[in-house]
């Protein structure tokens, strides 16, 4: 339907949705949406009550678009020659979803953070339904393409995890170089075929830039930026807000971090270090599971790191750092797998496992707290046994 054929409320929703896709959820306001729709800003409050009501309608449209994309993908499952493997076909389908709707996934990720930070129960419920629907689609797709019933959660978890890992990457070729090996390795592990180990990769400390903060003031500023990003996202973060949170002057903030981009980069590196250290500090398997499971919602640090990664989708200056963080994927999981007695895993196995677990967490992120830890643990244990054997 053409924009001009929509009623006034629908035009505002469409305008808000387009702004959110192009510039991020933080750019959506009554003023910006009304300006694009050619309406008065007061029309947003008239139709939707407040910004929260407006965002719910935009989220509903984003979820409808995702459902339409899934339906279109389902119509193309029979393509290709008969010798294509399940891994080949899953690679193609995920690549196509990212090519056609990468920013749509970014926007849904922003809505998840908005739902957690704002505590809007309607946003949370809708985000939960969206996550469940995406996982269910990939599970059913894997079954249609020939996966065994007991393996379908693994294929679905990896698909969802890779969509989340790669939706910030604008280069289709770069995305494909992550997708194809991951699905092939999952297929080999599930099929019990020979594994050709990959070369050892660099440690995270070798990939990410060194950030030795000058003094306690600089460290406080970075921690304040992390807190601000967790609360407000990257787009609404200002150096003035960070200075106030840190209890320092704006001049002190700009002395250590000349631009907002410098501050955001420092926050991303520090967040990655903190989250990784928290996982590795877990003394036993139960501790590791507690850190990785979505019990009680994501921590502020994990949420802030997610917000930074999402910001990189639209901010070219952040993309090299986002790629550097992605290059460390699996480094922590390798240590965790070793602790649990998996001694034959290589770096690709660890990346696949970490990404698959991320997909399971995405499915359960907004599930009832009483249910999600048990569900996550059961799926994790069953899949670990399928991929790596009983340990």
Q: What residues fall within each predicted segment?
A:
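Short, Lys/Arg-enriched anionic-surface-contact patches
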Residues: 1-8, 209-217
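Helix-turn-helix
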Residues: 11, 21-57, 220, 224, ...
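N-terminal membrane-targeting/anchoring modules of bacterial envelope and secretion proteins
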Residues: 54, 58-62, 66-69, 77
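Short, basic, alpha-helical segments at the C-terminal edge of helix-turn-helix-like DNA-binding modules
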Residues: 60-66, 269-275, 281
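Short, structured motif recognition centered on aromatic/hydrophobic residues
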Residues: 66, 106-116, 156, 285, ...
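Hydrophobic alpha-helical connector segments
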Residues: 71-105, 277-303
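Amphipathic alpha-helical packing segments from all-alpha helical-bundle domains
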Residues: 102-109, 119-144, 299-306, 316-341, ...
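Hydrophobic/aromatic-rich alpha-helical bundle segments in the mid-to-C-terminal region
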Residues: 124-128, 143-199, 319, 323, ...
């Amino acid at each position: 339907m053409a924009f001009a054929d929509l009623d006034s409320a629908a035009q505002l929703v469409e305008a808000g949705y387009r702004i959110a896709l192009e510039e991020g959820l933080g750019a959506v306001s009554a003023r910006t949406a009304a300006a694009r729709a050619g309406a008065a800003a007061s029309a947003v409050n008239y139709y939707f009550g407040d910004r929260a009501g407006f965002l719910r309608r935009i989220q509903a449209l984003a979820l409808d678009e995702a459902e339409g994309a899934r339906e279109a993908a389902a119509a193309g499952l029979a393509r290709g020659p008969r010798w294509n493997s399940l891994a080949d076909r899953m690679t193609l389908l995920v690549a196509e979803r990212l090519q056609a709707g990468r920013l749509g996934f970014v926007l849904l990720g922003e809505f998840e953070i908005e739902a957690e930070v704002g505590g809007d129960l309607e946003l949370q419920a809708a985000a939960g339904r969206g996550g469940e629907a995406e996982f269910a689609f990939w599970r059913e797709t894997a079954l249609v393409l020939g996966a065994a019933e007991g393996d379908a959660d693994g294929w679905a978890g990896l698909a969802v995890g890779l969509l989340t890992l790669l939706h910030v990457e604008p280069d289709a070729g770069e995305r494909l170089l992550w997708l194809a090996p991951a699905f092939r390795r999952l297929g080999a592990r599930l099929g019990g075929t020979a594994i050709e180990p990959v070369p050892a990769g660099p440690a995270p400390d070798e990939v990410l830039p060194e950030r030795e903060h000058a003094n306690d003031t600089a460290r406080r500023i970075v921690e304040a930026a992390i807190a601000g990003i967790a609360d407000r996202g990257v787009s609404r973060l200002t150096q003035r807000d960070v200075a106030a949170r840190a209890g320092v002057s704006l001049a002190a903030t700009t002395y250590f971090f000349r631009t907002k981009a410098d501050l955001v980069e420092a926050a991303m590196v520090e967040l990655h270090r903190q989250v990784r250290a928290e996982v590795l500090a877990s003394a036993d398997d139960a501790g590791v599971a507690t850190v990785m499971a979505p019990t009680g919602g994501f921590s502020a640090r994990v949420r802030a790191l997610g917000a930074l990664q999402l910001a990189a989708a639209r901010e070219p200056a952040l993309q090299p750092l986002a790629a550097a963080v992605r290059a460390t994927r699996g480094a922590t999981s390798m240590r965790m797998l070793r602790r649990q007695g998996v001694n034959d895993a290589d770096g690709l196995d660890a990346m696949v496992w970490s990404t698959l677990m991320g997909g399971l967490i995405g499915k359960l992120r907004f599930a009832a707290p009483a249910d999600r830890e048990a569900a996550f643990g059961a799926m994790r244990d069953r899949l670990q046994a399928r991929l790596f054997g009983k340990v």
